[in-house]
């Protein structure tokens, strides 16, 4: 994808036509199924990020000496900011930008590390004999499972076809813009 991204960025109209021919799909392309692996991965990433948030913010509020009943004052802005970053990267990935996909994969790795760290912390608390609410342990296991499902949905032939479709559409949009600029110059 990185090489095709560079070729699209520097290509003329005829070179873009060649790139689009390389990215032609065998059979019929269903545009509604094109982004499903990416959307599934994004939803699983969001769920995996959300799982450790209550325990994380309860710990922050406890250490800061703030009232525990206001913990959602930390959770809501944190998750909203994460959603903004996540959906920006997902949207740019769907538009065919290599750096956005790379950024999304880095974000996904960070979330997987957070979920794994939360699971290890909960297991350590459990084995040390601290009284834990079973919901926190279940949420830590679910966070790791969502991270694994997120990686798995990106490691499918459907996502590979989707990336080809994203790049094809980006090349088509750039070719259309170049054609439009050429037409406007010829009219002037």
Question: Language-model segments: which ranges?
Answer:
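Short, highly charged, low-complexity non-transmembrane loops/tails of multi-pass membrane proteins
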Residues: 1, 157-188
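Short juxtamembrane and helix-loop transition motifs at transmembrane-helix boundaries
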Residues: 34-41, 60-72, 98-102
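Generic alpha-helical transmembrane segments
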Residues: 47-53, 67-88, 111
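Membrane-helix interface motif
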Residues: 49-62, 120
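Hydrophobic alpha-helical transmembrane segments
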Residues: 69-77, 130-140
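Membrane-helix boundary connector in multi-pass membrane proteins
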Residues: 116-138
């Amino acid at each position: 994808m990185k090489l095709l991204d560079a070729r699209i960025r520097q290509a003329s109209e005829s070179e873009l036509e060649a790139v689009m021919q390389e990215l032609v799909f065998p059979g019929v392309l269903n545009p509604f199924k094109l982004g499903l692996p990416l959307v599934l991965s994004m939803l699983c990433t969001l769920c995996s990020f959300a799982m450790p948030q209550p325990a994380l913010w309860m710990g922050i509020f406890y250490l800061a000496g703030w009232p525990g009943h206001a913990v959602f004052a930390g959770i809501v802005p944190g998750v909203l900011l994460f959603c903004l970053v996540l959906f920006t990267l997902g949207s740019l990935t769907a538009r065919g930008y290599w750096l956005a996909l790379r950024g999304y994969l880095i974000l996904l790795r960070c979330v997987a590390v957070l979920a794994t760290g939360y699971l290890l912390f909960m297991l350590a608390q459990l084995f040390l004999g601290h009284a834990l609410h079973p919901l926190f342990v279940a949420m830590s296991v679910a966070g790791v499972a969502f991270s694994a499902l997120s990686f798995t949905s990106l490691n499918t032939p459907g996502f590979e076809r989707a990336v080809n479709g994203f790049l094809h559409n980006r090349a088509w949009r750039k070719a259309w813009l170049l054609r439009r600029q050429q037409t406007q110059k010829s009219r002037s």
